[in-house]
Amino acid sequence: MRISKPYLRSTSIQCYLCLLLNSHFLAEAGIHVFIFGCISAGLPKTEANWHDVISDLKRIEDLIKSIHIDATLYTESDAHPNCKVTAMKCFLLELRVISHESRNMDINETVQNLIILANTSLSSKGNVTESGCKECEELEEKNITEFLQSFIHIVQMFINSP
C-alpha cells in the first residue's frame, strides 16, 4: 500500500546539511545548529498536508467516475468556521463508506492516504471541543460528488485559517 508522507520528503537533505554544518562547526554553536536542524527535519509541515488532501480528494473524484457507487453520505454543506474540526471528523468517518462501497484498490489506497494526511494535519486541533455543532448523523445526506465538493470546501477553510 502506498502511503505518501510529503512532510518527510526533504528530511534527508536536512540531515546531510546538519552533518555538513556539524563537521565545520565543532564548537558549541555547531552542536546547537546540528541538534535544531535534526529536530526540524522530523517536524511535520502541516500547511502542505491540506493541499495534499485536496489532491487526494480530486483523485477520488476522478476514480469514482469510472465506477458506479450509489451511496449517500452525511455531508456538511455550510459549516460554520467554529465547527470545522467537527465537520472534518465527520467527513473522515464518511470516507470509509466510500472505501467500503467502491471495493476499488486505487480508491482504498487514496482514501487511506487522505485519512492519514488529514489526521496528521488535525493533530494540533483534534482535541478542540466545538459547541453548537451538528453531530454527523444530523447532517444532510448527499451523493458522493456533492460530498467531495463540500469536503474540498472544508479543507479550504483549514488552508485559509490562521
Curated annotation (Swiss-Prot):
Glycosylation sites: 108, 119, 127, 143
Disulphides: 83-133, 90-136
A GO cellular-component term linked to this record: cytosol
UniProt signal peptide: 1-29
Tissue: Expressed in many tissues including heart, spleen, lung, liver, muscle and kidney (at mRNA level). Expressed in many tissues including heart, spleen, lung, liver, muscle and kidney (at protein level).
InterPro entries: 4_helix_cytokine-like_core, IL-15, IL-15/IL-21_fam, IL-15_mml
Propeptide: 30-48
Keyword Ligase: no
Pfam families per UniProt: IL15
Annotated SUPFAM superfamilies: 4-helical cytokines
Keywords: Cytokine, Disulfide bond, Glycoprotein, Secreted, Signal
Role noted for this protein: Cytokine that plays a major role in the development of inflammatory and protective immune responses to microbial invaders and parasites by modulating immune cells of both the innate and adaptive immune systems. Stimulates the proliferation of natural killer cells, T-cells and B-cells and promotes the secretion of several cytokines. In monocytes, induces the production of IL8 and monocyte chemotactic protein 1/CCL2, two chemokines that attract neutrophils and monocytes respectively to sites of infection.
Name of the protein: Interleukin-15
Native source species: Oryctolagus cuniculus (Rabbit)
